[in-house]
């Protein structure tokens, strides 16, 4: 990504971890430094991506959408997002703040769905061609607490309706991925909002200092 002038910052975590709040905080911190930003979400962020999101998230497709189809839909949406939104923004110097990216697929499909990680990595290499975030923040939350918080938002979507064991597998896989990729910043999201935001602010301010 050295040829691109902007930066891609990704916020990761389970349902209820506070990703949307974190995205808003990062945007605010960057705006204070006069850095132009855009936000994205996965799956979605483009016209095609939002259509695919409506399929992936729709509870009507419980026990209908094959895991392999789900995986391919996610990568189709990600390719569109990268090529239509993220790269053009980075090329003009904007910083992109993304609610989920590649790590989610490894955790949810690889961990939660128990899909073959080698296959996912091969598909990732083919689709992304080495494209990676400049910074990833993983908001670590206990799955039970996360689902309590998520439930307060309203009716569960297709993914949120999965069993608690599903989310424990995702949580465990996130931890493995963080250990394998020390550049990922893990933040304890079980704490109060003020404490979580303070940790995020420290990471972002240090990142800005080294990238301006």
Curated annotation (Swiss-Prot):
GO cellular component terms?
cytosol
- Could you list this entry's UniProt keywords, alphabetically sorted: ATP-binding, Kinase, Nucleotide biosynthesis, Nucleotide-binding, Transferase
Q: What is its EC number?
A: 2.7.4.9
Q: Which InterPro entries match?
A: P-loop_NTPase (IPR027417), Thymidylate_kin-like_dom (IPR039430), Thymidylate_kinase (IPR018094)
Q: Please give the catalytic activity noted in the UniProt record.
A: dTMP + ATP = dTDP + ADP
Q: One GO biological process from the UniProt record?
A: dUDP biosynthetic process
- What Gene Ontology terms describe what this protein does at the molecular function level? ATP binding; dTMP kinase activity
- Give the source's domain of life in one word: Bacteria
* Statement: the UniProt record of this protein carries the keyword ATP-binding: yes
**UniProt record similarity statement:** Belongs to the thymidylate kinase family.
Q: What does this protein do?
A: Phosphorylation of dTMP to form dTDP in both de novo and salvage pathways of dTTP synthesis.
- PANTHER family xrefs: THYMIDYLATE KINASE, UMP-CMP KINASE 2, MITOCHONDRIAL
Record's protein name:
Thymidylate kinase
């Amino acid at each position: 990504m050295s040829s691109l002038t902007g930066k891609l910052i990704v916020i990761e975590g389970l349902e209820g971890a506070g990703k949307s709040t974190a995205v808003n905080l990062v945007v605010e911190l960057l705006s204070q430094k006069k850095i132009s930003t855009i936000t994205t979400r996965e799956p979605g962020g483009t016209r095609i991506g939002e259509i695919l999101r409506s399929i992936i998230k729709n509870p009507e497709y419980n026990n209908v959408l094959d895991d392999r189809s789900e995986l391919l839909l996610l990568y189709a949406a990600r390719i569109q997002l990268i090529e239509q939104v993220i790269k053009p923004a980075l090329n003009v110097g904007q910083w992109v703040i993304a609610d989920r990216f590649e790590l989610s697929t490894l955790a949810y499909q690889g961990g939660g769905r128990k899909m073959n990680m080698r296959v996912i990595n091969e598909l990732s290499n083919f689709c992304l061609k080495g494209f990676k975030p400049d910074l990833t923040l993983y908001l670590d939350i206990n799955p039970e607490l996360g689902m309590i918080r998520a439930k307060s938002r309203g009716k569960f979507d297709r993914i949120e309706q999965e069993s608690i064991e599903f989310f424990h597998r995702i949580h465990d896989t996130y931890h493995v991925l963080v250990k394998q990729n020390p550049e990922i910043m893990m933040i304890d999201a079980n704490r109060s909002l003020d404490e979580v935001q303070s940790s995020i602010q420290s990471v972002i301010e240090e990142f800005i200092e080294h990238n301006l």
